[in-house]
């Protein structure tokens, strides 16, 4: 009766865990996985451990990607596309982990090869950023995405552009681990010009979730500024996915009654159709700049142009290549470890066994016949406290 030979390390399909988050982060991870058809994939919403997980369960983190609202959107996307889900990577046994953020690095992936993928634009580097960088005891998430890359708990960090590589190195990220690949969703902004969004030639406002994440945001002043820029043209607001949509609609209706408001939809396609883009702190500014729109932003536009993600149309493919490199290194290490284990377990020839045994016994014999070993043991006073000295 024939038996199937067990799969070797080279034949076994690698297992890859993809840690998602916001819809932008989730779609990025999906695109990367599609470029790794030789691997078995599993996805999970963003997660933490210890007190972070306790706070999440208590619904104290609803303003973050850990919250139930954004977690549900992530899971809805994964279910809609029929993607395998392993919540919190509980199944284990992964050969590689991709994550959209290193502000929290779960304990159960810290011994695995990790690839960190930049999501988009960073939060401004204010006082919390400088405190977190100086005081290592502070958690990175206190400063928001400004501290991205500073955990050091990854093997490779895939970033959007050479400008961002320089920025992350200046912030303190290890230069030797950073790879410029471009980032999915922002590597081909021209594709968004092919859309069926019904409006054209308007002023688009991409608002932020600043208030939901406990940052200052004078919304009344901001809407007044938008009206001034629009100067009578059609004004359309695209709300941030994490924003309190009901409150935002109420404010816009009171201050800009002629404006249209969208809580859902593709912001990038709306940007492609607009004449003017107004943003606060948002990655959508990259799309506006890449498409040559008139842009008004809280971000320094000269800095945005320096940091603009590479328009290489191949970010997911480039990141997949980085993953393959790490998987190959991991496979080689496992093969070397197996070879060493097999060599150490192999039986020695009989004549060599006898010689090695005789040599070991001859070397060990003096320890058992020395007079100091045969003399009675006297304990010092220190033995009263559990410590025994031989004299």
Task: Give the location of each predicted region.
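A donor-sugar binding/catalytic signature common to diverse glycosyltransferases
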Residues: 112, 263-307
